[in-house]
Regions:
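Acidic, serine/proline-rich low-complexity intrinsically disordered regions
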Residues: 3-271
Length: 271
């Protein structure tokens, strides 16, 4: 008989999981959640909601940074991001204008010609526009999104691979990264919001310039049930000594002594 799927974690459970993840991986900034809203009443009812000042336009990555660094719960509408841009387009709050979709905005900047700039736009993951009126970003520790659509955290490559190892511990699956290039938020929260699949990406130039993403940071976005599986898997790995930070063994040492502890003498673990 197939194993019954556990119910999705609640906001309270995700708060606890986020705290455990911070301890396990020693994260620099807060794990966050994102949730789409389809009506103004439920959007405005989110506890502690902050809205950008009217007339000010941000990149989505700037507003995400306000949540993960300052701990704010931020409500995002189309009028809060650059008008008819990919910022709103990636999260489904607008369709990008023809200036973007045609490639004119990025031709001669990120791409040599209009053809390649247009291909970049055509292949970019996006949430279908017209379904949602807003998106709220909030730290998981605040438990204000019950539940979020996706959970996210920024980590170093070492932290990221250990989280993937945690995801694979109890249910193996091969994970792929996608890289759009510039506008790589499409590969993280854009793809995860659109597909509800775990998405791993390297933040782009704009995320680092405007959103303040550190040079060594990657971004993981996943549905709440995968977030739980990753944290629980990390805890299981910790029990067998596979923890963060990863202690370097030394390039001039025989690895057998270390590997034998994990895998058994001669590379074979005893039954």
């Amino acid at each position: 008989m197939a194993k019954k799927k556990a119910p999705a974690p609640t906001a309270a459970e995700l708060k606890d999981l986020a705290q455990r993840l911070e301890t396990l991986l020693r994260l620099r900034t807060l794990p966050i959640g994102m949730r789409h809203f389809d009506d103004e009443a439920s959007f405005d009812a989110v506890p502690g909601l902050r809205r950008p000042k009217p007339g000010r336009h941000f990149s989505t990555c700037q507003l995400v940074t306000q949540a993960r660094v300052a701990g704010l719960t931020v409500g995002i509408r189309h009028e809060n991001v650059r008008p008819w841009s990919n910022c709103g387009g990636v999260i489904g709050l607008n369709a990008p204008s023809d200036d973007y979709l045609s490639g004119r905005k990025m031709a001669g900047v990120w791409f040599a010609d209009l053809k390649n700039a247009r291909l970049h736009q055509a292949q970019m993951p996006r949430v279908t526009p017209g379904r949602h009126i807003g998106l709220v970003v909030s730290p998981l520790r605040s438990a204000r999104l019950d539940p979020p659509d996706i959970c996210l955290f920024y980590g170093t490559p070492g932290q990221t691979i250990l989280f993937v190892n945690g995801l694979q511990h109890g249910r193996y699956k091969r994970y792929d990264m996608s890289i759009t290039g510039e506008s790589a938020c499409a590969d993280s929260w854009g793809r995860a919001l659109a597909t509800r699949k775990t998405s791993i990406s390297i933040p782009c130039y704009a995320e680092r310039r405007y959103g303040g993403v550190a040079d060594d940071e990657m971004l993981v976005a996943c549905p709440p049930d995968e977030f739980r599986r990753g944290v629980e898997g990390l805890e299981a790995l910790s029990k067998v000594g596979l923890r963060y930070p990863i202690p370097p063994y030394g390039a001039n040492m025989d690895p057998a002594e270390g590997m034998d502890v994990s895998y058994g003498a001669g590379g074979k673990r005893s039954a």
